């Protein structure tokens, strides 16, 4: 299943879980698992093995969050919103805010 409502660079708000209420920027979309990685959210510790470029140790990095636990933030009305798809006159599909009908794609 492909995530059509979230893309890299979108601003989202976490609506459930440990990080509830926080907002951040989407770094990666993992559409096969229906998950997103958000900047400075769901920090997990990973044990890094040493390699030729650097030393090993315990590294803290962002972990994935399920896409159902986040909502898109509209840039115009500054509210979390559901995302709709609208077809323009030239045939191009764009994402729109369901609350203010503003185009979310840049």
Curated annotation (Swiss-Prot):
Entry-linked PROSITE patterns: RIBOSOMAL_L24 (PS01108)
GO terms, biological process: translation
GO molecular function: rRNA binding; structural constituent of ribosome
Keywords on record: Ribonucleoprotein, Ribosomal protein, RNA-binding, rRNA-binding
A GO CC term assigned to this protein in UniProt: ribonucleoprotein complex
Self-association state and partner proteins as the record states: Part of the 50S ribosomal subunit.
Function summary: One of two assembly initiator proteins, it binds directly to the 5'-end of the 23S rRNA, where it nucleates assembly of the 50S subunit. One of the proteins that surrounds the polypeptide exit tunnel on the outside of the subunit.
Family membership noted in the UniProt record: Belongs to the universal ribosomal protein uL24 family.
Protein name per Swiss-Prot or TrEMBL: Large ribosomal subunit protein uL24
Native species: Syntrophus aciditrophicus (strain SB)
